Regions:
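Active-site helix of classical SDR
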Residues: 132, 168
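Residue(s) in the substrate-gating loop at a strand-loop-helix junction
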Residues: 152
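C-terminal helical subdomain
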Residues: 185-188, 192, 200, 209-244
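Conserved glycine-rich cofactor-binding loop
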Residues: 20-23
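Substrate-binding pocket helix/loop in short-chain dehydrogenase/reductase
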Residues: 82, 107-109, 113-118
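Rossmann-fold cofactor-recognition segment
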Residues: 59-75
């Protein structure tokens, strides 16, 4: 596991948006950030699931709000509306974690329908690009914001049978590297995290015969995310990190 011990008030008063925060890694990270003092914005398309995570955070004394947005169907107007809402409510954004993702069909590229590739690229790449672009003024306003893209081992070394998902994660790594160079002078650090095998619904779909008890829970892989969101990672940008 990534070796980092987060101080008690690491993210005090920071505004952090986590996509795909209704379950899995996103939900665990949102709760972890709130426990360390952050005001967390939980994005997802399942309003009921988001509200449940939000209520758990509020019940434990944390600060959170929900942002219902379907990344598969969102257009420029929707992203602009999100940016305006956050500008009015917070005026800045200290952290943006692109966690939401779509697995798509685990088949050979030869067998991958073009529509399936387009759908996976929309959620895993285009949405991250469009949301980042819309929120750049708020990230700049924070002074030293952190932007995190979720990658995968199959986005760093191609593997047959991972089809559209692997292609999308290679694109994610490229997006991270370009943003890192372009935003360096703005003090915005941009990195990617490969969570590794984690006990999530996506993992279960990819490995249906695997015993989930043999892979780490989402809470176990949070240290790398917390490190990147906190001040200890100042100067760390353009890096492809592993959670475990």
């Amino acid at each position: 596991m990534f070796d980092y011990q987060a101080p008690a008030e690491l993210l005090k008063d920071r505004i952090i948006l986590v996509t795909g925060a209704n379950r899995g890694i996103g939900a665990a990270l949102a709760k972890g950030c709130a426990a360390l003092g952050a005001s967390v914005i939980l994005q997802g398309r399942d309003a009921a699931a988001l509200d449940q995570v939000c209520q758990e955070i509020l019940a434990s004394g944390g600060q959170a709000e929900t942002l219902v947005l379907d990344l598969e169907r969102a257009d420029a107007a929707a992203y602009a509306a999100v940016a305006e809402r956050l500008r009015q409510r917070h005026g800045r954004l200290d952290g943006l974690v692109h966690n939401a993702g779509l697995l798509g069909p685990r088949v050979l590229l030869e067998e991958t329908p073009a529509a399936a590739l387009a759908q996976v690229l929309q959620v895993n790449v285009q949405a991250g690009f469009a949301l980042t672009q819309a929120l750049l003024p708020l990230l700049r306003a924070a002074g030293e914001a952190s932007l995190i893209f979720t990658s995968s081992s199959v986005g760093r070394k191609g593997r047959g049978g991972w089809g559209a998902y692997s292609v999308s994660k290679f694109a994610t790594e490229g997006l991270m590297q370009v943003w890192a160079e372009e935003l360096a002078e703005d003090g915005i650090r941009v990195n990617s995290v490969n969570p590794g095998g984690t006990r999530t619904a996506m993992r279960a779909a990819a490995y249906p015969e695997e015993d989930p008890a043999r892979v780490p829970a989402a809470e176990a892989i949070l240290p790398v995310y917390l490190y990147l969101l906190g001040p200890a990672s100042r100067g760390t940008t353009g890096q492809a990190l592993n959670a475990q």
